[in-house]
Amino acid sequence: MAKKSMIERDKRRSRLVAKYAAKREALKEEFRQAETLEDKLAVHQKLQDLPRNSAPNRRRNRCQVTGRPRSYYRDFGLCRNVLREWAHQGLLPGVTKSSW
């Protein structure tokens, strides 16, 4: 189980990403449309002024059950340990143990 502080920090980052997503996307589009270097620098500075944790790549994918940050399966939102347990218990529809 991950530390509660790390899980909460990641939740806070997720909220910031959602809050600033529209503004960040608008600024990025404005940056693409800017023609002069001065305009691009001004828009870039506005992007830099946004909170650091509002960038989507600062988020970390974590298991929804344990909060484990590694060996995360995106299709399920679970780490490998929980995925294995739940698959054995039949809690994941359509997931079967492979056999060849």
From Swiss-Prot:
Residue runs in coiled coils: none
A Pfam family that the UniProt record links to this protein: Ribosomal_S14
rRNA-binding recorded as keyword: yes
Key words, A-Z: Ribonucleoprotein, Ribosomal protein, RNA-binding, rRNA-binding
GO cellular component, one term: small ribosomal subunit
Keyword Ribosomal protein in annotation: yes
Any one GO biological process: translation
Stored InterPro entries: Ribosomal_uS14, Ribosomal_uS14_bac/plastid, Ribosomal_uS14_CS
Disulphide bonds in the chain: none
Listed GO MF terms: rRNA binding; structural constituent of ribosome
Family note: Belongs to the universal ribosomal protein uS14 family.
HAMAP family associated with the record: Ribosomal_uS14_1
Function: Binds 16S rRNA, required for the assembly of 30S particles and may also be responsible for determining the conformation of the 16S rRNA at the A site.
PANTHER family listed in its UniProt record: 30S RIBOSOMAL PROTEIN S14, SMALL RIBOSOMAL SUBUNIT PROTEIN US14M
Quaternary structure and interacting proteins, as annotated: Part of the 30S ribosomal subunit. Contacts proteins S3 and S10.
Name listed for the protein in its UniProt record: Small ribosomal subunit protein uS14
